[in-house]
Amino acid sequence: PVKNFFFGNVKAHCDRIGKICDATKFSMKDVRIESCDTVMRIDNCDYASFFGFSNVTTGSSVKIEKTGGECRYLNVQTYPLVPVNYQSIRPGEVWLDTEGKPIQAHGFQVTFREGKYYWYGEDKTHTLFGTNRMFGGVRCYSSTDFYNWKDEGRIIEPATDPHSPLHHCQKLERPHILYCAKTGRYVCWLKSQSNDGHFVILEAEHFMGPYHFVRNLKPNGFAVGDFDMYADPDTGKGYVWFERPHWEQICAELSDDYTNVNG
């Protein structure tokens, strides 16, 4: 049987994609069908997962049928793919951007600047668990009312160089961006879980990037876990609080340019 088979970003003019039979694990993501009745039939699959299936002509969801053998796990998530305009926050629902796509900003931060909210976080659109494809960059959204969020694109891109600390195989999480008044630059810290825990530090002239790698950092030689950051608006001093995993919480003062710590 087929194992760990994945389709992504499929565009097709068809009545159906076909039938999947005897697959150990089968996933399809972000599928845009323009004309469809029954799109998919699945038979005797241990695990089948379908994310973002939609008919782009009508904005409606598409039809998936189970036939024959048992499917032990079936997960289907469909989205309208039409513009949305929220009047409130809807707990328990998948939050969509203004184009009708699921918001991809995990492990996020929200900041307010120049009359807009900016929500940025990990882009998991193409993350495939069970593979080495983990880091999809950092995506940013903007809003004036905190309900409706416009996709501004990725402000940090995953690297294609396998030796880069930003390569898609790296386990990078929880981006934090501070503005450093002394340098006039934006500094981004990410937590890396690859190998031992450390920070990956980037810098940019503009909040929306492009960001450039500065250094990897283990403050005072400590491995790092979850963290938070703060810049004091009165003194201009920056601080990082981080977990020494399963051991203790540590606070360190940042260097003047926010790209290191002062002991």
Features from the language model and the residues they span:
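Glycine-rich beta-solenoid repeat tracts in large extracellular/virion proteins
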Residues: 1, 15-22, 38-44, 60-66
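Short intrinsically disordered, low-complexity coil segments enriched in acidic
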Residues: 1-13, 82-85
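All-beta strand scaffolds that present successive hydrophobic residues in beta-strands
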Residues: 2-7, 26-30, 48-53, 71-76
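Surface-exposed loop/turn segments connecting beta-strands in extracellular beta-rich domains
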Residues: 10-15, 34-37, 56-61, 76-81
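A cross-taxa feature marking solvent-exposed loop/turn segments within ectodomains of secreted
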Residues: 13, 26, 35, 57, ...
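A generic "binding-loop/recognition-motif" signal
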Residues: 24, 46, 207
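Carbohydrate-active catalytic/glycan-binding domains of CAZyme proteins
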Residues: 79-263
